Amino acid sequence: MEACFWQPGPLLAVPPAPPAATTPSPAGLQGGGPLSVQPLKAWQLPLLQDAAYDDLIPLLQRALLLQGPERLLHSLAPRPSLAPEVLVAHRDPQQPLGVVVSERCNRSGSCWQLQHLRSGDACLQAGEAGRMAIEAALVRAAIQRSRGAASWIASSANTDNVRLAALRQLGFQPLRRETLWRWEPPAEAAQLNPASLPSELQLTRLNRRSAATLWQLEQAVLPAQLRQLLDRSVDDLLDQSEQPSLMLVDANRRQAVAGARRLRLGQRPVV
């Protein structure tokens, strides 16, 4: 089970270049200066040697390459996100303690998501209090740096009490609980025969022409609060989907009655 949280974001303008966030060194981490949270630099990438970061390295490399173009292009016009924002926490720049990866959920930038929040070995050895302090500093800095965000969304496993407590301390409110399933189709999956469908139903692929039909269905079934938080447009739905994505359309009413979308990698908040 996973718990999904949201938090209202800053409604006032955020300074164009906020200073690096610093907090006193968390209990359990001896020596060094105050905790600092700053954008990840290219020279810091080889320092992320902990196993906790292994699966993030390709994403972090992409972020370093595309963060500049992402900021420039988004300032010119609403468009899908090219790369996430990556912040790193440290007392000594040569010894990263944790990383947070966040990204816009929509073209407008009104909703952001925490994609990854990872703690290194040194942070974990500091105990729960040390880990909570570092992760809280990372999330707080990510929220402060976002421009125009009206809401933030994060998810956490129900069993991770430290993560849940940290999110609650930062003002995140429980939104809903989900059960995640992993489906592994057989090697020779049966193919759907469109002729077997009722005559009034048409199997339609998601594309720019049909996207509005599926968007209307999703808007109708989403809880009102979640619909408001996500602030998703038709373009956002297309940006976040890839093929195969299909829907069943009632030809008489010209409405989608069912649909399944394949999400692009990283579109779901997985902290």
Role assignments for model-derived ranges:
Residues 184-253, 257-261, 267:
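Surface-exposed interaction/gating patches
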Residues 125-144, 165, 169:
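Conserved acetyl-CoA-binding loop-helix of GNAT-fold acetyltransferases
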Residues 2-70, 194-229:
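Short amphipathic alpha-helix that is part of the acyltransferase structural core
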Residues 63-136, 250-271:
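Conserved donor-binding loop and adjoining core beta-sheet/short helix segment
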Residues 84, 176-178, 243:
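Short hydrophobic/aromatic beta-strand or adjacent loop that forms the aromatic wall/cage
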Residues 146-157:
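Conserved GNAT acetyl-CoA-binding A-motif
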Residues 173-186:
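Conserved catalytic-core motifs of GNAT/GCN5-like acyltransferases
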Residues 158-176:
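Conserved active-site alpha-helix within GNAT-family acetyltransferase domains
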